[in-house]
């Protein structure tokens, strides 16, 4: 076909690119990598926040995700931010309706086994 699928940083069949460590596979923007059947773990690689996946035999699809500054609010969240409620408490304040915390019980220290 002649075209290199990794040229745009969107698709790669390299079995080791899950680590996103080489310059060929390191996109400029934030990442979301998706591999069939692999569990995603949040991580920071070379200053890029994204999802790092466990190695897999299946191809790895890397899709840039919008940065928080540019992403629009989810439907419904704009209503929450547009109409602050009267009962909202300042940051760090406790709500009187919250249940009390359980008492802490000190356990006796165990001595070294003989």
UniProtKB/Swiss-Prot annotation:
Motif residue range(s): PTAP/PSAP motif: 96-99
Stretches the record annotates as Interaction with the capsid protein: 48-72
Record flagged with keyword Thylakoid: no
Topology class, membrane: Lipid-anchor
GO molecular function: identical protein binding
Region (Disordered): 85-114
Biological processes annotated in GO: symbiont-mediated suppression of host innate immune response
Region annotation (Interaction with host HPX) ranges: 28-68
Main location: host cell
Cellular compartment(s): Host endoplasmic reticulum membrane; Host cytoplasm, Host cytoskeleton; Virion; Host cell membrane
Region called Hydrophobic, residue ranges: 6-24, 33-53
Annotated positions of the Phosphoserine modification: 71
GO cellular component: host cell endoplasmic reticulum membrane; host cell plasma membrane; host cytoskeleton; membrane; virion component
Stated role: Small multifunctional phosphoprotein involved in virion morphogenesis, egress and counteracting host innate immunity. Plays critical roles in the final steps of viral release by interacting with host TSG101, a member of the vacuolar protein-sorting pathway and using other cellular host proteins involved in vesicle formation pathway. Also acts as a viroporin and forms ion conductive pores allowing viral particle release. Impairs the generation of type I interferon by down-regulating host TLR3 and TLR7 as well as their downstream signaling pathways.
Family: Belongs to the hepevirus ORF3 protein family.
Miscellaneous comment as given in the Swiss-Prot or TrEMBL entry: The viral particles present in feces and bile are non-enveloped, while those in circulating blood and culture supernatants are covered with a cellular membrane (quasi-enveloped).
The protein's name in its UniProt record: Protein ORF3
Native organism: Hepatitis E virus genotype 1 (isolate Human/India/Hyderabad) (HEV-1)
